[in-house]
Amino acid sequence: MNTLINNTIRFSVSTLSCAVLATAMVACDGSSAPQVKATAGIPAGLISKGPATGTGVSAVKATAKQGETITLVGRIGGSEDPFGQDRAVFTIVDPALKSCSDAGDPDHCATPWDYCCEDRGALKRGTATIEITDSNGRPLKVAVRGMSGLDPLAVVAVTGTVSEQNDAGLLVVRATKIEVR
């Protein structure tokens, strides 16, 4: 029985390692994900240009409660691809944190919006997930990357309802308004 469990764990770790390696190899080749320009399914007026001002992600996370309406400001990023695949979901990072492009060496990193140069603990405390949902609270089935200025490192102010928040650092906001600077 122990051999079966050990083999299963080895296979799982091996498979996960291959997936991570493949992702890293794609990230290093300098290519970027395709830009999506369609706005199908997004409520009119939900995304607009504006000053994108408000309180940073870290400060909001410290006091946010599930069910309350909040406004927070951040830059789109936090991972190699901060956008959900074919879903209206993305992550934002507190503007006080520095992306790799803020380090002064433009050739340092092919994906500066992943914040790989930032402390992992600070990044976890300063990241929030934003969802644009249907009437049932499910993320819309539309990719939002490139839509109305929603691009990596864009500064956004998001107003919405806290749908999830926990002590492990998770904050999910259902957006009712997004301003893109």
State where each predicted segment sits.
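Bacterial N-terminal signal peptides that target proteins for export
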Residues: 2-17
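C-terminal motif of bacterial Sec signal peptides marking the signal peptidase cleavage site
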Residues: 23-27
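OB-fold and OB-like single-stranded nucleic-acid-recognition modules
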Residues: 28-181
